[in-house]
Regions:
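A charged N-terminal "starter" segment
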Residues: 1-132, 171, 175-180, 207-217, ...
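Active-site-proximal loop/turn and secondary-structure-junction residues that shape catalytic pockets
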Residues: 47-51, 72-73, 93, 114-116, ...
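Conserved beta-strand positions in the central sheet of alpha/beta enzyme cores
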Residues: 67-68, 111, 135, 185, ...
Length: 364
């Protein structure tokens, strides 16, 4: 089901708005859970990808845990009925207030991103006599072969504890009685479509985990984060990502220990394809360079990815007909970066036409 099937009804609505294919979402979740289940893997939903209440309800119905990166996300997960025992709290800069709230909810684990954060969580847990469960987020220095703005696991990154600091982190744990390590956590980037990257990543994880084994440290949980990409160029060609290939290469490459649980934090791959941003053409014009421009009522305030890192989304006309020609599709914000596409191929665009921006269900 796509927005195109409901063009007549959609023309009567105020724009812009998001259109969600809830059946595609349900099918995507079912496929992800089934493929992960073949190997006993646990999937958490990265709430930052989309926290629309209907989306979150579908996630809970599918039985996924939740990955949060703010105190408000932890609160939303709790209020949405997610058990605290299935919530992990990541985020490179957690505030004291957020940490205290998550401690009070007794969430499953904090993914800790610096040596100083370990000390802060220990001190805040000690205030109420609690012991916080933590996983060390380790930066493995792996090239994810994706856009630099969504690469999060290379050496020159703000994310995680450098693998060269692992020894120091473990020594510090001996003097922090109010935290208990339950595992290690990674996340190397987003929109990764080359499966070889995940294989190389798992090889690095194996080496890091072996170091822990040699230190006599038992890791009950391995959290590999997420990163699986989707087909922005051809949303109809493969609407459900390759979960079989993704979990399969991890299973073939990752060396788990007996009794160990492997976790994933998926966001984009679960929800992106199910969402479209429907917008109306307000004006058309041609600039001095001869470029045809369609000015629409949606902007970077509704979908920031194209402005933030020149992300591509396929744009289609729901109402136009005829031969395709290139258009710049731009929003109303007073920023030159408020452009969804510089050369979207569309039939002749007229004032009042409805356009739909595909694969917009994540990170709008």
């Amino acid at each position: 089901m796509s927005a195109r099937q409901y063009t007549d009804q959609l023309q009567k609505l105020d724009t812009p708005f998001y259109f969600y294919d809830m059946q595609l979402l349900a099918d995507t979740l079912a496929k992800a859970v089934a493929e992960a289940g073949k190997y006993g893997y646990k999937v958490h939903y990265a709430l930052k990808a989309n926290f629309d209440p209907r989306i979150v309800a579908a996630i809970r119905k599918a039985g996924l845990g939740v990955d949060c990166v703010s105190g408000n996300e932890v609160r939303l997960a709790i209020e949405s009925g997610c058990p605290a025992s299935e919530i992990v709290f990541a985020g490179v800069a957690k505030s004291d207030k957020e940490i205290r709230y998550a401690l009070g909810q007794d969430i499953f684990s904090f993914n800790c991103e610096s040596l100083q954060e370990l000390e802060v969580i220990n001190a805040l847990a000690a205030e109420t006599g609690r012991t916080a469960r933590i996983a060390l987020r380790i930066n493995p220095d792996v090239d994810p072969r994706t856009h630099k703005h969504i690469s999060t696991g290379q050496a020159d990154s703000k994310f995680g504890i450098s693998y060269t600091e692992i020894n120091e982190a473990i020594r510090s744990l001996n003097h922090l009685p109010n935290i208990r390590i339950v595992g290690i956590h990674f996340h190397i980037g987003s929109q990764i479509t080359d499966m070889e990257v995940f294989g190389n990543f798992c090889v690095k994880v194996n080496k890091i985990q072996q170091w822990f084994v040699e230190q006599g440290i038992e890791l009950k949980h391995l959290n590999l984060g997420g990163g699986l990409g989707v087909g922005y160029n051809d949303p109809d060609g493969k609407p459900i990502p390759d979960f079989a290939g993704y979990f399969g290469i991890v299973n073939r490459t990752l060396e788990t220990k007996p009794g160990q649980t492997v976790h994933f934090e998926l966001g984009r791959s679960l929800v992106a394809q199910s969402g479209e941003l429907v917008t109306r053409v307000l004006y058309t014009k041609q600039n001095a360079a001869g470029r045809q421009i369609a000015l629409v009522d949606a902007g970077m305030t509704d979908l920031i990815r194209p402005a933030l890192y020149q992300a591509h989304h396929k744009i289609e006309s729901l109402t136009g007909q005829g031969p395709l020609q290139p258009y710049m599709v731009a929003g109303p914000v007073c920023e030159s970066s408020d452009v969804f596409a510089k050369e979207a191929l569309l039939p002749e665009v007229k004032r009042g036409d409805l356009l739909t921006i595909r694969t917009a269900g994540a990170y709008g």
